[in-house]
Amino acid sequence: MRTNLLILSLLVLFTTNMHSQSSAWFSSSSEAKAYAQKNNVPILLVFAGSDWCKPCMMLKAEILHSKEFEQYYPSQFALLYLDFPMQSKNKLSPELTKQNELLAEKYNKSGFFPNMVLIDVQGKILGTLTYKHQTPEVFINECKSLIEKTKIKE
């Protein structure tokens, strides 16, 4: 009985966690844009190399998948995760690869990874964020500050 309760609890926790990760986390630019328009929020483009870029892996593990960030971001922006994997086992679909390359040409000309760019639904750059091995709380405060600055400009 105790084992069944533990398994059920873990299943509920896992399902809830997966839901929170997927609520505003996208790999498709059209889906991210639709979410942003519907919720009147900007889009955070996250350029990452999931299988070769150590800082990208750390950003994802320490910030993007942190409980604090997962609770914060869905009401603040759509997160568009633009992956550039190197290993063939992680290869993206041709459509996703093309989408990511086109967005990188426009918003990540320097080729810096990880790179985070906040844009509005029309594609106008509102600002950038940098991962500096900070805590989720510090990163969230940087997000809040950037979003506040964009509201002042409007």
Positions of PLM-derived features:
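Bacterial Sec-dependent N-terminal signal peptides
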Residues: 1-23
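Hydrophobic beta-strand anchors of alpha/beta hydrolase catalytic cores
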Residues: 44-45, 79, 116
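C-type cytochrome heme c attachment motif
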Residues: 51-55, 114-117
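Short active-site neighborhood of thiol/selenol oxidoreductases, capturing the structured segment around
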Residues: 39-53
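Thiol-based oxidoreductase modules, predominantly thioredoxin-like and allied folds used
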Residues: 23-26, 69-98
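Typically the conserved alpha-helix immediately C-terminal to a functionally engaged Cys/Sec
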Residues: 56-72
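Non-catalytic, surface beta->alpha helical segment in thiol-disulfide oxidoreductase systems
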Residues: 62-64, 102-106, 110-152
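A short beta-strand-turn-helix
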Residues: 26-43, 73
